Amino acid sequence: MSKKKENPFSFFSYVKDESDTSSLPPPPAPIHSPSSSDNIEIPLPVFNNNNNNNNTTTTNNNTNNSNTSTSNNSKNNRKTAISFDDDDDDGDEEDEEEEDDDDDDDDDDDETNNIKSSLPQLQPQTQPQPQPQPQPQPQPPIKPTITKATPINKNVNKEINNNNNNNNNNNNTTTTTINNINNIATSANNAGTTTSKKKLIQLFDDDDTNYDDEEKLEKFDRSTPMSLPKEIPKKVSSTLSNSFDPNIIHNQSSPPPPPISIPIPLPTTDNLNNINSNNNNNNNNNNNNNNNNNNNNNNNNNNNNNNNNNNNNNNNNSNIAPPPPSSSSMVNNVNNNSSDNSSSNNNEENENLKAEITKLKTLIKGLKIQCIKYKGDKELSESKLLQSENRLEQFKLKEANETKIMEDMVAQVEENLNAMKKRAQYAENQVEQMKQEIQQLRHQNQQNSMNNPEMQELRYRLQDAKEKGRMVSQLLFQASNDADLNIKNLMRGIETLQNVSALLFSIDKISTIPNQK
């Protein structure tokens, strides 16, 4: 069995409809920061008698275009949300299939290691610090560019006559169109933010996701703590509010600041609670804005009907002078530009949010894998702790038994020592008593010997016997010596007699020996 290898970043499938691409606004042009070397030429509005009425007619068209653009944006947001949910469901089914494959194949660890080595490592997101904007330097005077007047049509003359008769109606329509544009911009912004926040809440509320595919991801290095921005700085918030406010008309000396994209802070429990509360508030605001938009659309339709009736009634008045140029056309142009910018910014924000959601999903999967591994490590450590605790208890019991045995032995030795001490003391007492008795007996013997006369006579007799024995021994020694000398002299006489007898026996032989001369 071979495991399914899938791209972990395939949770988005962007839905593109050919019908909606035509109505989408073009992407915004990049805004350059002002420099001293660039000569900026800003076109100034020129009000002609012929163009005033064209501006009044284009306001209603702009409101309709803005309504269609916002509706298309909301459709796109809904389609991306539906596709996002479908991809999540497909991912869950695939995860269940892979769980079955993993149960059959537990020995395919090398493949997972290769997949892990092939995946890119995720780095912790860090918030870019807002760079200080350079101070604008004095610039040379800007040359205004004058736009050419368009040719006058027959319909324009009719509208001029209608405007002379219906100045009050036009003032009401301009105010309503401005309010409509503002409400549409705010509703578009709120719709983009609410969809993204709902997706974030769904990400962190899903607890039924499968974790088999997550083992393919690489470990995320959590050695560095991730910083969670609690609040947006005041400077950045002020620049954001100024950059997206459609009612602000920027001067020539201070060009509009570029839009600033701030990274989304990582979600915590406090942030999720705040997001839920903000979502409820945003939903209520969106409902109120939709109701206001419907009311404004009804008012616009009524005003258009009144204008048409007035045009039919005043076709004959063709030579009346045009009214003075009003500032409402300029405000409408600025509002239209701001609505286009806001829609383009909303699209960019949606794309950025989708990219960040993908990163956050990979982060969440990595963190879930780490949680699973940490749980396994925790269980192993707990089992080791239990084993070590059991060993400690057994060791403590052994030590307690050994200490008891040693204490018993020490107690017995102490008892024996005490008994030996008692015996030694008793023996010493007995020895002292015997010494005293011996001294007493000696004393008594001396006293008895001094007092008895018989003992004295016996002593004298012994002394006489000793002296007599000495005298007898000396006399016997002298007698023995004299006897030895006498015996020796007798032996010498015997020898001499033997020699003489031997000479006398050899005399006959000597006489018979002839003489030889």
Swiss-Prot record:
Q: Name one GO cellular component term.
A: recycling endosome
Q: Which family does it belong to?
A: Belongs to the ENTR1 family.
This protein's source sits in the domain of life called: Eukaryota
Q: Which intervals of the chain are annotated as region Disordered?
A: 16-148, 156-175, 216-351
Recorded protein name is: Uncharacterized ENTR1 family protein
What is the native source organism of this protein? Answer: Dictyostelium discoideum (Social amoeba)
Q: Which residue windows does the record flag with biased composition (Low complexity)?
A: 48-75, 271-320, 327-347
Listed Acidic residues bias regions: 84-112
* Compositionally biased intervals (Pro residues): 127-143, 254-266
Alphabetically sorted, this entry's keywords are: Coiled coil
Q: Which residues form a coiled coil?
A: 340-452
Q: Does the keyword Zinc-finger apply?
A: no
Stretches of Polar residues bias are at: 236-252
Q: Does the keyword Coiled coil apply?
A: yes
